[in-house]
Amino acid sequence: MLTSIKEQIATDYKASGVEEELLVDGNLQGFNEIDLMDKDSESSSMVYIEKLKLKTEQLAEGFILVPMMNVKSDEIILLKAKDKEQVENLKEILEAEKRSQIETWERYLPDQYEKVKNNVIKTDGQYLLYVTYDYPEKIVQVFEESLQ
């Protein structure tokens, strides 16, 4: 599913006029891909786990895609709850992240603030998706198709 999301982002950037290849060897150029299950002390996963107030025992899987530069509000979080009992709590964590992002961007860059206001949070079974992106509906479609 994460690969399909990265492919969609690369397609969208190309359609918007970005000429360079964005997806190289499975990596999305210009984006940090954070594996929340990576316990390596050199990994940035701990920063995001603390920021979101996540407990890794709630997760079977978790990934975040964010731009390397902090001038874009794009943020895609894909979580798989360890069990169904964790889904509602994880959804609340994602809703808190949206509130935090709204507070950050409403004072910083108005165009990015609009993007955050249009954020989408979806759940399907044990999967959760958080999307702040120019075309959130495209990422939601990839999410839904991947779970069929």
Feature map (PLM): residue ranges:
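Soluble, non-membrane globular domain cores that form compact, hydrophobic packing
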Residues: 1-75, 81-148
